[in-house]
Amino acid sequence: MKHGKKTFVIIEAVLGILVILVLGFIIYKQNGHDPETIAVIIPDVDESEWSAFKYGLKMAAREYDTDVVIISKDNMETANDEIEIMNQEIAKGADAVIVKPIANRDGQQKLKQLEKSVPIMAVGDTFPEEPSGLHTIEPDHYHMGADLAQKLLENYRGNLIGKKIGIYSQHATSEAVIKRMKGICDTLKGSGAEILWSVSKENDSKEKINLQTQRRVDIVMALDNASFVEAGEAAKDNDLYGAVLYGIGNSTEAVYYLDAGWAQCLVAPDEFDAVYESVAELIKKRHNFFYKMKDRQITYTVLTRENLFSEENRNLLFTISR
């Protein structure tokens, strides 16, 4: 009997030591001197719309003593492409991932599976129709659309009777575009305006979409940076046939079209803040196994030619132009 009790005590002691060793190993890995590696997976990284994003990464990496690896491939067009790249980076030793998700339901489920391996933060956009369950840092897309429409109403003194509007985006199925569109429609309800068409570059029919072939409208509203830049170039070339441009964007080209008078209003999300906060959340998770990452909402600014170079917008323009 005594022998059995002694054996039990020894087993308990050994298990206790093992638990201490495992916890010690976890703490060592999370708080050791080697910096964490964060893989950042985004499309078209050389586009200027990512300038503020990349500058935010640089500053956050310096602040948190973190190695940041940016992965961008021209052929990354589907969620499966994105997942494959993420798996490769995790296999190479990435401790966490920041990703701009390619929105579809299959990709959503695969990202949730990957999050069991390493912490993942989605930036800028999530998934349509239902909550993704992923941690996200993004602006309030609905209110961005609503504020864009509100500026339009202000400029027309609340009277849009007889005015025809065209809405242009790159990905009509993304949650960001869906929410922005709803914000616009809710705000313009009862204004007298008619939305004559709403088209996106990416569509099920694979038909090539361009603004010049759309029915003529009085106002074009572009719901993302690429669409705004394309519409700005069309306005510059008189291919909008006199339509005025309002939209959402965050690149030097977008600011140029506003400053030059080819657009009336630009709503610009703070991409610097988005990625900086993403790194901060991931580092907190890496340093504390029990930390629960938080979704965060970043700010945005309604820019016009009148306030574009004001003191309060200096930092935003600085990060966009980096």
Feature locations, PLM:
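Hydrophobic alpha-helical segments within soluble ligand-binding/sensing domains
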Residues: 136-162, 250-254, 269-287
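Short beta-strand segments enriched in small/hydrophobic residues
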Residues: 27-53, 70, 134-135, 163-173
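An alpha-beta-alpha
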Residues: 57, 148-191, 290-310
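Periplasmic-binding protein-like
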Residues: 39, 93-101, 119-123, 166-168, ...
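Venus flytrap/periplasmic-binding-protein-like
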Residues: 121-128, 224-226, 236-266, 304
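Flexible loop/hinge segments that line or gate small-molecule binding clefts
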Residues: 106-143, 251-259
